[in-house]
Amino acid sequence: MEERILQAKQEILEAPLTTLAELESFRLHFTVRKGLVAALFGELKNVASADKPRIGQLLNELKQTAESRVSDAEAHLAAAQNSKQQPSLLDLTLPGRRSFCGSEHPVQKVLGDMKSIFNAMGFTIATGPELEVGNYNFDMLNFAPDHPARDMQDTFFVRTGSGNTPDVLLRTHTSPVQIRVMLDEKPPIRVICPGKVYRNEAISARSYCVFHQLEGLYIDKNVSFADLKATIYSFAQQMFGSDVKLRFRPSFFPFTEPSAEVDVTCYLCGGKGCRVCKKSGWLEILGCGMVHPNVLRNCGIDPEEWSGYAFGMGVDRTVLLRYKIDDIRLLFENDVRMLQQFKA
């Protein structure tokens, strides 16, 4: 008896119930009044009294299994029927939408090219915080106490220091990174320092209150201004082309001596004069010079033994030069029409 019950249970579990016809055949064979389950219950009276509780339990489990399979099949078939009757919300005949393909921002593209050029010259990359203390941003770079760059009109101060509390500001250049490198490392040093900088300037076609800057520092024995010029010329030729024209002008920076500014022929007018170059025919691309002895001393480097040069350039202005863009504000406005022009 027990073997027959287990065999019937196996048949119930394996019976296919994917159609209404299969479900009806299942009922007729197992669950109706004259079906197999009822017939097995009828034979319970012939079982020995000692075995009746166990066999009765097996029969009840068999009946529950059969009824459960019937109810599950009914629910599944009803759901399938309803889904066929309801119209689909998905119209497979509609044309698909093309996914939007982004591209590298021109500032990041040019900055990456700059890094590659200087990496090939042996420069490594150094970074530092954008929120800086006045000591690193001004004092150790040989800025005079009354230098105009320290004024509120030129610098975004987060907190003005007093007593032992230092000034806290948004860095106006990446030169503080050079200070940190010189304090932490011993010469020879050859690094570039890319990053965002902030200045309290009027926004115009040529200037913005936040921009990207890349500075370089090289300290070694017997470094000369000729080494600096060779580096600048090599960079400019790789960035703007071998026929680029440069102009070095004497200038003043507190942290370099002697100092110079480097101009390149205006990309819009070709040197004839326009509103972008203010009718001069030239555009400034960077400032440079030999590291001031006071800066070296402030960082614990003996200027009698070591010398070096430094330079700094605006990455955004280089983007304007390279792609002939006449307004720096376009780089920060997130106008997708402009950005789509730089797809690879």
Swiss-Prot record:
Catalysis performed (reactions): tRNA(Phe) + L-phenylalanine + ATP = L-phenylalanyl-tRNA(Phe) + AMP + diphosphate + H(+)
Cited InterPro entries: aa-tRNA-synth_II (IPR006195), aa-tRNA-synth_II/BPL/LPL (IPR045864), Phe-tRNA-synth_IIc_asu (IPR004529), Phe-tRNA_ligase_II_N (IPR004188), Phe_tRNA_ligase_alpha1_bac (IPR022911), Phenylalanyl-tRNA_Synthase (IPR002319), tRNA-bd_arm (IPR010978)
GO cellular component: cytoplasm
PROSITE patterns (alphabetical): AA_TRNA_LIGASE_II
Any one Gene Ontology molecular-function term assigned to this protein's record: phenylalanine-tRNA ligase activity
CDD domains found in the cross-reference section: PheRS_alpha_core
Cofactor note: Binds 2 magnesium ions per tetramer.
One GO term of the biological process aspect: phenylalanyl-tRNA aminoacylation
HAMAP family in the record: Phe_tRNA_synth_alpha1
Subunit description: Tetramer of two alpha and two beta subunits.
Protein name stated in the entry: Phenylalanine--tRNA ligase alpha subunit
Chain's gene name: pheS
